[in-house]
C-alpha cells in the first residue's frame, strides 16, 4: 500500500486502482518497486491517468455544458 497523502474521491477504490496499476505494469513489462526507475513508474502512472480519463468520458457520454 502506498503512503500517499492523496485522498481518494471514492472510498474503497484503492484496490481497483492497485489492480489497474499492476495490470498496466505487466502490460508495459515494468517491475514496480523501490528499484524501478522514475521513468518506468511514471509511464505506468501516465497510462493509469489516460485510462481513468477515458472511463470518465465514457460515463459522461453526451453530457455538455
From Swiss-Prot:
UniProt record, GO biological process: DNA topological change; sporulation resulting in formation of a cellular spore
Gene that encodes the chain: sasP-2
Keywords from the named record: DNA-binding, Sporulation
GO molecular function, one term: double-stranded DNA binding
Domain of life: Bacteria
Organism: Bacillus cereus
Family: Belongs to the alpha/beta-type SASP family.
Function of the protein: SASP are bound to spore DNA. They are double-stranded DNA-binding proteins that cause DNA to change to an a-like conformation. They protect the DNA backbone from chemical and enzymatic cleavage and are thus involved in dormant spore's high resistance to UV light.
Note: SASP are degraded in the first minutes of spore germination and provide amino acids for both new protein synthesis and metabolism.
Site residues by UniProt (Cleavage): 23-24
InterPro entries from the UniProt entry: SASP_alpha/beta-type (IPR001448), SASP_alpha/beta-type_CS (IPR018126), SASP_DNA-binding (IPR050847), SASP_sf_alpha/beta (IPR038300)
PANTHER family membership: SMALL, ACID-SOLUBLE SPORE PROTEIN A (PTHR36107:SF1)
PROSITE patterns assigned: SASP_1, SASP_2
Protein's name according to its UniProt entry: Small, acid-soluble spore protein 2
